Regions:
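Glycine/small-residue-rich phosphate/adenosyl-binding loop
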Residues: 22-24, 47-61
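Local cysteine-cluster metal-coordination motifs and their immediate loop/turn environment
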Residues: 70-88
Length: 167
């Protein structure tokens, strides 16, 4: 929500330990001009997952026991950062049928060597709400900026697109 309120895409992420304690947080900061260190902001690389991972400082043993939670299925950039982070577990609340890239895991020798666990949407209503908020954000100036994105969302999560168009 904080990302949305600052004019960025409404995506957030956090890293938690094995007991569920939050160790770091990040949000999309693409449209923000300032952020405290270590967060990225003001460019197309300032994604929520990347910011949560940049803020996560821990040794390898703690990293391997941690989990990354994120609003939407990570894009190629964020999936790569997650993979490089040594965190072994990923949870996301909504599919991202246009840019989501968890399907890349296991497709190359490099992306096959770590035992990664991925957990996708567990709550269909939450996925609809997340998609609706993303649609509303993209249409906030009256125009959906990428029709292929909307098309992919419409095919995968039609109720979310319909709700987002009503907001």
């Amino acid at each position: 929500w904080a990302a949305y309120c600052t004019g960025s895409l409404p995506i957030g992420a956090c890293v938690v330990d094995a007991q569920g304690n939050i160790l770091s947080r990040g949000r999309n900061r693409i449209m923000e001009n300032q952020a405290e260190v270590p967060y990225a902001c003001g460019n197309t690389l300032a994604h929520a997952e990347l910011n949560a991972l940049l803020a996560f400082k821990a040794d390898r043993q703690v990293r391997r026991a941690a989990s990354l939670y994120t609003t939407t299925e990570p894009c190629p950039l964020c999936l790569g950062a997650f993979y490089m982070s040594s965190i072994r577990t990923l949870h996301y609340a909504a599919r991202e049928p246009f840019a989501g890239s968890t399907n890349l895991l296991g497709t190359t020798p490099y992306l096959s060597r770590k035992p990664i666990k991925v957990y996708g949407p567990a709550d269909a209503e939450l996925e609809i709400l997340i998609t609706a908020l993303a649609v509303e954000f993209e249409r906030s100036d009256g125009v959906f900026h990428t029709s292929s994105v909307l098309q992919s969302w419409q095919q995968a999560i039609p109720a979310g697109v319909e709700l987002g168009e009503q907001l």
